[in-house]
Amino acid sequence: MSHEEDLIDYSDEELQTTDAAATTAAPAANGAQDKKGDLTVSGGRPDKKGSYVGIHSTGFRDFLLKGELLRAITDCGFEHPSEVQQVCIPTAILNVDVLCQAKSGLGKTAVFVLTTLHQLEPVPGECSVLVMCHTRELAYQIKNEYARFSKYLPDVKTAVFYGGTPIQKDIEVLSNKESYPNIVVGTPGRLNALVREKKLSLRNVKAFVLDECDKMLDQIGKQAQIAHMRRDVQEIFRATPADKQVMMFSATLSQEIRPICKKFMRNPLEVYVDDDTKLTLHGLQQYYIKLSESEKNRKLNELLDSLEFNQVIIFVKSTLRANELDKLLRECNFPSIAVHSGVSQEERIKRYKEFKEFNKRICVATDVFGRGIDIERINLAINYDLPADADSYLHRVGRAGRFGTKGLSISFVSSEEDEKVLKEIEKRFEVALPEYPEGGVDSSTYMA
């Protein structure tokens, strides 16, 4: 079987999904429950002595992390951990499994990056940490987070593997003991291909992490590519030792997906947002505009001309629409780029870096950028095409207003289907989205 037959392109979320299961926090069958602000916390392995729920830290030093990690954290300018970091890290560093749902932009990635780096004792030629996510861009971003926090840990080697690039390059990295990574980040299709070919050994894995876990494990009512992804995750999981730490994270975890996640775990610490309304993003102003399909381009042009913003991400539902809209914007002298699965992997990473490094201020994207991508200067998100469900909406608009900062989102509503989704969003999050005011919005209310 060729390598390419194993590589399914999961990274574009353009096929519209139809279900958006309600997400409400339920206490675990085992363990007490503790409310901390927006979070519901429960569980933790019973074989561990004491209770770690409710540990509150005012600074990262209180976590007793390695000195090298604290230096890197200081270099990044971080002073105080977010609430999800306060709740998760003290328990996670004790090797307890973690299932965490927290809204976008609150530092979930740092939970597993800092935890695994703190626990890691690198052995040359051995992979100890395996992190999987559903898109190549997110994998690339996570790898960069590991690089950022391991800058004072010179013996730690990290590599990222995903489809769309020659697999031979990955094999070369894994064939050299000097470059063999202690931490592997990647997408399930490519990782499973490397495991099947016996190029990547997982027999020494001590930490198994899924970021945006619901996207990889939920196959009920979803497109076939999600089912393939779940199959790959299961095969990879079986290739790892039974005794390991498992951590899973997402901004949305429905009641249906939680039991599936927990099948991979042993008595995990469970951290959930109290209820769906808490999933809305504080500091992010959200509006909609009713208009016809033919009016979208003119209205978008008006918004980009009139609104102040640092960077804007514009979501569309297909690669074709992304290309056409990007072309139109550039013809109107807007500094735009497009990111979607139709672009080669090398070019996608190049464009991602251009946008991340503020060389471009406008990005037209499909849902490939809808989850997990953290670009701190984005403070405006526009749904040129409304997504198919409330969960996708939350992930999209969460690109603006990261880590509790201010932001603005505007959604175009142009069809009966859009109106149904809008009502679903309002019902799900118990919020009435206002119509965008004719006079516009005061920039001081969403510009940091």
UniProtKB/Swiss-Prot annotation:
Its EC number is 3.6.4.13. InterPro entries: DEAD/DEAH_box_helicase_dom, Helicase_ATP-bd, Helicase_C-like, P-loop_NTPase, RNA_helicase_DEAD_Q_motif. It is found in: Nucleus. It catalyses: ATP + H2O = ADP + phosphate + H(+). GO terms for biological process: mRNA 3'-end processing; mRNA export from nucleus; mRNA splicing, via spliceosome; subtelomeric heterochromatin formation; transcription elongation by RNA polymerase II; transcription-coupled nucleotide-excision repair. One of its GO terms (molecular function) is ATP binding. Keywords: ATP-binding, Helicase, Hydrolase, mRNA processing, mRNA splicing, mRNA transport, Nucleotide-binding, Nucleus, RNA-binding, Spliceosome, Transport. It is an enzyme of class 3 (hydrolase). Residues 283-444 form the Helicase C-terminal domain. The keyword DNA-binding does not apply. A motif (DECD box) lies at residues 211-214. Residues 19-43 are annotated as: Disordered. A motif (Q motif) lies at residues 58-86. Residues 19-29 have a biased composition (Low complexity). Residues 89-271 form the Helicase ATP-binding domain. SMART domains: DEXDc (SM00487), HELICc (SM00490). The Q motif is unique to and characteristic of the DEAD box family of RNA helicases and controls ATP binding and hydrolysis. Belongs to the DEAD box helicase family. DECD subfamily. This is ATP-dependent RNA helicase sub2.
